Amino acid sequence: MITQEAKIYYIGTATALIEIGGLRLLTDPAFDPAGMLYTTPAYTLHKLTPPKVMAEQIGHIDHVLLSHDHHLDNLDHAGMQLLNAVDSVITTTAGAERLNNQSPRPGDTPAPAGIHAVGLANWATIEIPTKDGRILTITGTPCRHGPAGGDRGPVTGFVLNFKEETKDGIYITGDTVWYEGVEEVGRRFDIGLVLLFIGAARLAIVGPDHLTMTVEESIKVARLFGHAVITPLHFEGWEHFSQGYDEIIREYTAAGLLDRLHWAPPYTPEK
């Protein structure tokens, strides 16, 4: 089973290293140092903590699973610069077009040349050969990055499994709130591990609504996938995150689900 074989390492924010079948996959690369301010016409993001390792310490990456390219807490400047060194960047269809065409984000410089980005629509699946002779399937899953009706750009999640296997897949939620799209993932897939983006991100321009899952919503995900291990991501390191480690521990304890949590160990570079 893929969940028994996969090794997950935490790097920071929504950045995690997944080692499976000889492949090294990286989610939402963010490697800029602490203290960075990212100013757009609509808002400013403030990064508070550094990544566990810097981009040059991570080693070779085969593929990047990028939930979206247009927010700097999911793809920052240093993360952008490593994208042309990987075999493919799997992301939204809109994001793939921007990256392949070197289109700049608002207030940012263009993407580097040489990126091979693949757009993945909701429920579409691509196949990637592993280095041990198997086939890894990656399926796009829906996300809603905040309250209904807002235009915050497309975001995708992912379900990973080996071809011909249907049990105990890995679900990477991406930046989403709890809504019917997440529930549909539960109807379509048997999941054994959830990399769950939490943080209850909030920005003044949006008002009191949250842009990513609250801890309370994440508990709904844990109950939806009743036997899955829950690995939190996207819960620390930014000023606009309103919930973090303490809230996760408190609410999961109150819900009787503390034993479902597994904190991914930080990645340590090989000597």
Language model segments and positions:
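Structural motif
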Residues: 23-25, 62-63, 88, 136, ...
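Metallo-beta-lactamase
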Residues: 1-3, 90-167, 250-271
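Divalent metal-coordination and catalytic microenvironments
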Residues: 18, 28, 68, 76, ...
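Pre-active-site segment of Zn-dependent metallo-hydrolases
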Residues: 23-66, 70, 77-82, 147-150, ...
